[in-house]
Amino acid sequence: MLENIQRSWFEHYMVPCFSPAKFIPVRAKGSKVWDQDGKEYIDFAGGIAVNSLGHAHPELKDELIYQIDKIWHIGNGYTNEPVLKLAKRLVENTFADKAFFCNSGAEANEAALKLARKYAADKYGKNKNEIISFKDSFHGRTLFTVTVGGQPKYSQDYAPLPQEITHLPYNNLSAIREHISENTCAVIVEPIIGEGGVIPADPAFLQELRTLCDRFQALLIFDEIQTGVGRTGYLYAYQEYGVEPDILTSAKGLGGGFPIGAMLTKQHIAAVFQPGTHGTTFGGNPLATAVANKVLSIVNQAELLTGVLQRHDYFMDKLSKLNQRYQIFSCLRGKGLLLGAELDKAWQGKAKQLTNLAAEEGLIALIAGPDVLRFAPALNIEFADIDEGLVRLESAIMRFVG
């Protein structure tokens, strides 16, 4: 007999660090989700930019089933075939020489920051330890990464915090020029600030970061947890900007819904991570890396990446026309299928209210702070699903504006 699982169990049994929707999704296919009552939703969230190829993609499912019958976990005392294949694929398709695998974006950023600190200490001495990040950025929930992130609301309750971390204004050339010094070991930046408002970097800003890091012997880290794996219409966003980092972090869409994180870097930097300096129990496990291999084999095709750019134009055109009718958004921005719609002054602070109404109308969407709706659908979302999702968003907006 099937157990009747209730939404109220969340409050009864689970630590309350999340505030989930009142419905429970139980089934999904492509860009559609169904809850316990059979209600259908169009998914414009993609599990927060995770479900890069939608839900239950048949090729990912087949790959996982194939690997399940072979080997699940062996531990880091051994390597395995899927992880070696994935490392080779990433190295051959990016700037990197070496790859490290873990389980999440936070772990990937933790590894990147530790690597940068150790590289600087080994090469230049322990006084070269400052990490520069940017206001409104988000890099994870570990104590190190949450402190490096530029949103104090996430770190203020956990003092004492890691030290020698500086937060500067994003897209501000003068601020970084004035502050960076010989004591800076790394600069970490999101090519598009995601959680903090969907704000793309100015090309000149990223180019200047590269120049300054070279001048002061600091490492440039691109956090591509959210922008990577085709999200912007390129395999990684750095490729569009034409700015090569020293370290890149990837997660979310890399596993297409299966947990995985990766840190990519150059040979001379990776060399400081000798056995025992860093590690992971589950990172690089055969199941996750098998699925990630299949994701990359599908995403890194010209047809799919071109399709992301086409969907960007289509989505933004439809969203702009919707906004002309209601004048609710002051700004539409983003790249590829990482899009933000900032509420006009009269509606600021109410993004969550609007996404709640959207859910009632059968649309799953995200927020990026109190004022911004964020959309990160599957890279292969059907155009008909974009149309239907925006119809449902319009229904929510009609209720929202009263």
Curated annotation (Swiss-Prot):
Gene this chain is encoded by: astC
Keyword Transferase: yes
Cofactor or coenzyme needed: pyridoxal 5'-phosphate
GO molecular function terms attached to this record: identical protein binding; pyridoxal phosphate binding; succinylornithine transaminase activity
Superkingdom of origin: Bacteria
Keywords: Aminotransferase, Arginine metabolism, Pyridoxal phosphate, Transferase
Family: Belongs to the class-III pyridoxal-phosphate-dependent aminotransferase family. AstC subfamily.
Protein name listed in UniProt: Succinylornithine transaminase
Top enzyme category: transferase
Source organism (scientific name): Photorhabdus laumondii subsp. laumondii (strain DSM 15139 / CIP 105565 / TT01) (Photorhabdus luminescens subsp. laumondii)
Matching CDD domains: OAT_like
Enzyme Commission identifier(s): 2.6.1.81
